[in-house]
Regions:
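Small/polar-rich, solvent-exposed N-terminal microdomains that initiate assembly or binding
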Residues: 1-52, 56-58
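Short Gly/Pro-enriched loop/turn and capping motifs at secondary-structure junctions
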Residues: 53, 76-78
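Acidic-leaning, charged glycine-interspersed low-complexity segments
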Residues: 85-129
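A generic structural micro-feature
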Residues: 39-41, 61-65, 109-113
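Oligomerization/assembly interface segments of phage tail-like spikes and tubes
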Residues: 63-76, 113-123
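Short, charged, solvent-exposed linker or helix-capping segments at domain edges/interfaces
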Residues: 56-59, 127-129
Length: 129
């Protein structure tokens, strides 16, 4: 079974519209390596799982799990954020993730704008028998 963050990475990296702004090699899972934390390498994306838990039980077996994902987008300009973020939101919505929180700030560590968005989805547990 693929981890939820891997599923999101695949969704984002295989989209041509998003790839025209963010090189798929600039989409990171969990952390951005220090060598890649460079303003000249922006825009970039980081995907983190915030929380997950099983739900919807039948006969004492979980049928689904709920997962919260955070996607951080770093850009050099506000215009880049305005162009890229709607693509991410649309892709997540098309894949049954509902956006429920966001924050926009200037990352003082690397002097880039950071758009952090949180998404939630309920996924079926794929039981292989």
């Amino acid at each position: 079974m693929m981890l939820p963050i891997q599923e999101v990475e695949m969704i984002l990296s295989k989209n041509d519209a998003l790839s025209s702004f963010v090189d798929p090699g600039r989409i990171f899972l969990v952390f951005v390596p220090e060598a890649d934390q460079d303003t000249e390498k922006a825009p970039m994306i980081r995907i983190n799982e915030l929380e997950s838990h099983r739900k919807d039980y039948a006969d004492d077996a979980a049928l689904t799990f709920e997962v919260d994902i955070q996607i951080d987008l770093w850009t050099k300009t506000l215009k880049e954020a305005q162009q890229i973020q709607p693509i991410i939101d649309d892709l997540m919505a098309k894949n049954d993730f509902q956006q429920y929180a966001s924050a926009f700030d200037r990352d003082p560590d690397i002097a880039l704008y950071r758009y952090a968005r949180r998404y939630r989805a309920t996924k079926m547990i794929d039981i292989q028998i």
